[in-house]
């Protein structure tokens, strides 16, 4: 990206490791404080929890060094916006994440409370520990490190939504309404995966979602198969053919 200055990789690795070691207990507690909030977007009874989680993210973003952070309304669950300004001419990175999680049911399959983080063999078990409170926390702490150590060379914006797990029904309208606020040079998505635990991966693209309702209409009365079979298309056969051809081989 034009205008970005990169620091020495070996120095950064040592410095980051030291920062993590010095702040590990705090990092974990802040992460766990988010996990403990049952921000299940598919459950309409969790509206209060959704707002509480958004407010918690706002607080953590300000603590990490954002110039401003706010919880913004939408037609559904609120979104969290924050930014750190370095310079008018500096490139801007927009970091996307989501604070909502999937339902934890069936609860009898869990060995521990899904909303009370439990560490077993060096791994954290809880709903949202990974998707997406874990990845978003990594981005937040990387941002915090860059700010506090004086390494930040570009403007940073955060946007966290609360409906990703239900298809982001309110996101498009929000983006259109606030397109100037969210203007950026590049977007970093905090909701991807690694090929293996010891193999960090750079994801350059994700598949989206698309929904259709298809209606196939045929004759308005029963037709004798001996007279019309094969000559008049059966709506079921037509629909099967359509579905089979929707995949691009």
Descriptions of predicted regions:
Residues 130-205:
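Acidic/histidine-rich catalytic neighborhood of metal-dependent amide-processing enzymes
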